[in-house]
Amino acid sequence: LAIELKDFTIDEYPPKLMLIDNETGRTLPEKAPEHLLLEEGVTEGQLSDWLVTIRQTIPWAASVATEDTVKFTEFHSMGATYAVYLQAINQKTKTAKESWVSCGSFIFPYKALRLDSLTSLIMPEREPQRFASTVKVYTEDGKQVEDTIAVNHPLNVAGWNIYQLSYDDTKGRWSDISVFELVRDPWLPAVY
């Protein structure tokens, strides 16, 4: 068998915001980390003592370094990242901070917001919900089969089950590599 990758697609869960300890990098509160899921329509939420208000969202963004800061702009191309401009107000101290926050990508670095000497607000990498590969499979006898392989939805060709195993997670949605597992069990039909 030979497998040609035609296309790779991934559906990701919405991005989320979390607080981390600046010294250890651990999420806060340590025993039960909180997160703010940035689902469509969410404009504010609470993380510990911080009220977070989303001012602008750019789902396909690129970071641009200016003289003294980093900002984000629309970028509909390979390596685009998710970015939000937000304000965080500490409900106890009334300290206010605002900045861009982004999970980054293999091209653009992540951007965190340092809230105080102890705490920063971050957007961790987005988690995959579903990923699949459109492939063309060539068999020894000259057949060509084009289909989509997804996790837990293998493709059966010439007695082989081809499973979607993983992808290049450093590139995320931009992965140009799919990892497959090929399983052949000629005895299986005889058992049943």
What do the PLM-derived regions correspond to, one by one?
Residues 1-192:
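Solvent-exposed, non-transmembrane regions of integral membrane proteins
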